[in-house]
Amino acid sequence: MISDIEFAFSECNFQFAYKDLQKINLYIKRILLLNTRFNLISNSNSNFNSILNLHVIDSLLGLPTIKEINPSEILDVGSGSGFPGIVLAIFDTSRKYYLLERSKKKSTFLKMIKLELDLENVKILEYEIEREKKKYEFITIRAFRSMNEYALVLKNLLKNGGLIMAYKGKFDKINLEVNQIKDLFSKIEVKSLNSKLSLDRNLVLLYR
């Protein structure tokens, strides 16, 4: 299975160390093993290569933007089974990642993975987003919901000059969502995620 990860990463021109591939391999295997117990991903995607291509690769496509902005800490909202937070933390060990997940089941899984993969740069926050009081310079979210459902709540957690990086799908749908929230932010930028293994994906950067 590590050979599959190595091939996929090479196709996307990702830089990696073998120890990181081992962690990703173990992480995917744990999702497959515990999916039924913790309700981590949909059954239609519950095979190794689907998780690798649809979730791991997709999560990593945001890392160049993170390195470009270079925040010291990142809040990942609605981390679920750990996409993108766990994946980013594996390859970005110099930064602190706060993974916010309200579901007890999923946050329990995240705590298990944090320990097993020895991710010292990860902290799991198990509560509703409305309880979070800390301000962040960078927030990630990878959700199927429309941006207008969470834009204001997340904006209130941003430091001045901070930004939200939302993983999104088709560009035409993004335009509709952006028009609904454009007055909330000083600048909105859409970045196309070009990858052989990731179809029609974009990042939306919302600047406070």
Swiss-Prot record:
A GO MF annotation of the entry reads: rRNA (guanine-N7-)-methyltransferase activity
Q: Which InterPro entries match?
A: rRNA_ssu_MeTfrase_G (IPR003682), SAM-dependent_MTases_sf (IPR029063)
The top EC class, named as a word, is transferase
Q: Which UniProt keywords apply?
A: Cytoplasm, Methyltransferase, rRNA processing, S-adenosyl-L-methionine, Transferase
Q: What is its EC number?
A: 2.1.1.-
Pfam families, per the entry: GidB (PF02527)
User: Where is it found, in Gene Ontology cellular component terms?
Assistant: cytosol
**Where is this chain's protein located in or outside the cell?**
Cytoplasm
What this chain does, per the entry, is described as: Specifically methylates the N7 position of a guanine in 16S rRNA.
Question: Known HAMAP family for this protein?
Answer: 16SrRNA_methyltr_G
Name the family. Answer: Belongs to the methyltransferase superfamily. RNA methyltransferase RsmG family.
Instruction: List the protein's name.
Output: Ribosomal RNA small subunit methyltransferase G
Lineage at the top is: Bacteria, Pseudomonadati, Spirochaetota, Spirochaetia, Spirochaetales
